[in-house]
Structures are given as C-alpha cells and as structure tokens.
C-alpha cells in the first residue's frame, strides 16, 4: 500500500471520528435541552404523591364507594388516556387514574420496573394519597395483567374488576403483530438492549418521538396545548421506561417473547396470580381489529381474532364465578378512546354489584355498541 493511500485512509478515519463525535455532541446537547425543557414545563393533570423519595402522579374525581382505579395499557402514554372514562365514572363514584413510574407525570423507578414493583407502587400510592377501599380495578391491555397481580397480592382490598381487551398471558399472536423489536433476530435485539442507554443519552429516542401524536378529547380542548407538550415530552420517558423493563425481562434481548404482552416476567406473574373468586368481573372484548392489505396477513389476523374473542377472552371471564364477557362491536383494541361509554357502563354494573344493589352484573345480549350513548 502506497504512502499516499495510507495517509488518505488515516485522514478519512480522522474525519469519520470527528463527524461521529460531532453528531454525538449534538445528540447529547439535544437531549439535555429536552430534559431541561421537561423540567421547566409545569403543566400537570393530577397531583404528585410522595411514595418514598420519589413521586407518582394521580388524578381523582367523584365521590362515593367503592373507589375505581384505572390501570393503563402499554405504549408509554401513562394514565391520561382515561380522561373521558373518568368523567363518566365520576358521576356515580370515586375514580382515579395514575401514571406508573417513569410514565406521564410520575418520577422514574429507581431500577428497571417489574410486575412486583408496579403493583407495590400502586399500593403505596393509594395508601399515601390516601384512598380507602374497597377497590374496583379497571385494566386495559397489559394493564389487565397488573389488575390480576395486584388482586393476588392484596386480595382483601379488591372487590371487583373490569378487564378492557386485556392481555392473556398465553396469547400467541401472528409474527407480524408482534412489536418491531420482537420481530428482530436475537443478535439485533441484544444490540438494541445494550445500546439503549447510549441512545437515551444521545437523544435518539427523543428525536424519534418528537412528533408522536397526542389525542386530547374534544371536551378537554382548554388543556390541549399544555397536555400536548407535556405528554409528547413525557412519552420519551415512558417509552424508555418500557424498553428498559422489557430488556430486563428478556435477559437483555436474548429471549424472544412471542406470547402474552411481550414481557415474560409480567405474563408469568399474571399466569400464577390465580383466580378472582366470586368478585364481580366484566371482560370487555374489542369486536374490531386491524385489517392489513396483505391477504395472507389479513387471514392470519382474522383467525387470531376469532381465537381472541371465542377462546382467550372467555377464559379471562371465567377467572371469577361472577364473570361476564361483553363484546364491544364498534371498537378495536383502543376501547378507552373509541368506546369509553362501554367501559363506564361496565364499571357501573360492577360498582352496583359491589354495593350489593344487585347480586350479579346485569346480563346483556353479549354486545355493547360504542358511540351515541349519553353518560349523563
């Protein structure tokens, strides 16, 4: 190799190193500015409750017993998705939503979250808020698994439950329905998990999430600007928290989760949590589902949805001797946003049963139609 070629290679490596350092410095600066802006943004829905050196956010409204606690699904958005549901439930009893550690307006967890840390956080939050039982727990998606785990841990405090298109620990979705990370080869997953702390520091996740949509219900337009800015920034924190939890639960990406919620630790804890006894229970199941253009994918998803409606969700309803499944015909998985009235109706039935005003949850024809119901 000639002298000139070696010099050219050395210069190229120097320039490459310079460019990489420049990009890293820009990313680090971008992330630090973002974190500073997060700290300066004071807008909040709810209130901070100290749970031992850190705070969790909770928002409550309404009066009466039992207290309804709303447990969110995944995605890093936190509890704000429950605003419309909360408004309806508050007309007949006390109702609260909260942000899990590392999501929404809550402080991060001291280490990677686990199923135990999530339910222990909620228990401590309710104690310090303070909010007295009995409780009716409402869980959407993988939040339904936390409802089951909490009930097993603190059975004397839970009087009833509503599972909203809840994750089943044994569900096995078609590969293309798995999260993008779980579709990757093992080496790629391990690389992502090992590189994630650096990606966080260099602002990569913040950059990818900068235009994430935030849905503010029409009746809450007065808070649109504050909520949009707050939750868009906070979802960065939420996604990072969920990724950290997922990597810890899969041995740094070595294990490929193809069942349940995609988090083996949470799924296993829900699986062994046991039954719900004779507590009033309603299982709401989405009647609609994603229909891709690819005919093979569409057929596999349709087959999975049939299993979902007729096997997996009925199994959840049989967790209680007083369980009932209701199919929400006009909604997909996002029932809190697309059919909040179905949740409010289900919660009202469970609340009445807990109060002893009816022995069983009210029988229905098996379906609830979303949209058009008056919650007044």
Which residue ranges define each predicted feature?
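Active-site loop/oxyanion-hole signature of alpha/beta-hydrolase fold enzymes
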Residues: 61, 97-138
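N-terminal cap/lid segment of alpha/beta-hydrolase-fold proteins
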Residues: 36-55
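Flexible "cap/lid" subdomain of the alpha/beta-hydrolase fold that forms the substrate-access gate
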Residues: 115, 162-314, 318, 323
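Hydrophobic membrane-insertion alpha-helices, especially the h-region
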Residues: 14-29
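Alpha/beta-hydrolase
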Residues: 70-72, 98-100, 164, 285, ...
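Catalytic active-site module of serine/aspartate enzymes centered on a nucleophile-bearing elbow/loop
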Residues: 319-376
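Conserved hydrolase catalytic core segment
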Residues: 132-178
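Conserved HGGG/HGGXW glycine-rich cap/lid loop of the alpha/beta-hydrolase fold
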Residues: 50, 54-105, 153
